[in-house]
């Protein structure tokens, strides 16, 4: 009994020691903020509390893991002691009874779990990450004001998510609008405002070339001058969801961990309200580069910057030479929404499609979830099994509701024209970029039609994209 009491005393001493250190850290270690800062504004106080909450959550995770390890060690010691006691008591066999040490009930170790059981999810130090946002602006003062207000209203921490505004075009009213935000943002101005020399028949595309020039300068500043490890890129015509920052914070470790990922996007190209599942936590891998609020790592930019295109940068990003068979993470419910009807595209794409995309309204705690299912080694087998495990039905059956008793269904396409017919009928995007359909992964596009999950898939022996499909 004395040995049992010693184990318990040590265990409780360790637990009390840990809890005292946590309490001392938060009560005394951080020091008081100067009074003038505390009184500065309610926003700064809110940001500080948010940072404290994130750090506390991380510390609790660490403490919980320590307690688990202590408990495991305790069980090992008790198990060994029980075996020794049984050996002394004429080698009594069988499962040891529950025993009590110093009045604390203990439970004999549970049987060992099968080796194939999933390991506990990896814990990430989210509060230590710094992920800046760069907002690309030009000459729309009201738009940049709206976008910055949206970012600032949802940002949990100024230190963790600093906001940079990169302005092109030299527009004074836009510059004044940015300066209104004072120290809440960092204002950068693209210095090269010279006209771009293009053939006469290409002059109408000059705006696209200026945008590409601006992107390169802005990302060079963020990655090469400031040496940030990751950057979230947005434009000046985006509203962001309440969990925009939470989403990128949670997916950043995956982007670092999985070499088959090269971006995280906040956008679902097929994210119309009637074509999505109302599940804010649902995420996918996608071979299609979506843009419209996306995160990139410095190691990728170092490769892209020297060969950055003079124009049409987004389509260039979608080319196999850049994508290199890597994927992006994208949500079922978009975390950005564009209100920019007028821009270089003259509003055509906005009226036909963009204005119908649904923005997520419900905060989802991604950082408290296990997102390891998005790693390629986990995702691909499960995704293929799910898609090719559901019943295959004709487009006519789906359209006519003859398969409505099925919660999920697959419709097979055999060529480009067949794919376009199916997607047009289901009311989703029909085009390809370098052979990849919007939101496609492993040749598969998914949406919701009349409340039913539909997978638009090639034959199961699919071998890759046809880069000439457009």
Could you describe each region identified by the protein language model?
Residues 130-132, 162:
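Cell-envelope/extracellular polymer assembly enzymes that use nucleotide-activated donors
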Residues 132-140:
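A conserved hydrophobic helix/loop-capping motif in glycosyltransferases and polysaccharide synthases
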Residues 169-229:
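Active-site-proximal specificity loops/subdomain of glycosyltransferases
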Residues 227-239:
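Short beta-strand-to-loop acidic/aromatic patch adjacent to the donor-nucleotide binding site
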Residues 241-315:
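Conserved catalytic core of nucleotide-sugar-dependent glycosyltransferases
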Residues 149-161:
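Short, acidic, metal-binding catalytic loop of nucleotide-sugar glycosyltransferases
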Residues 5-26, 309-470:
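C-terminal catalytic/acceptor-binding lobe
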Residues 1-85, 102:
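N-terminal signal-anchor transmembrane helix specifying type II single-pass membrane topology
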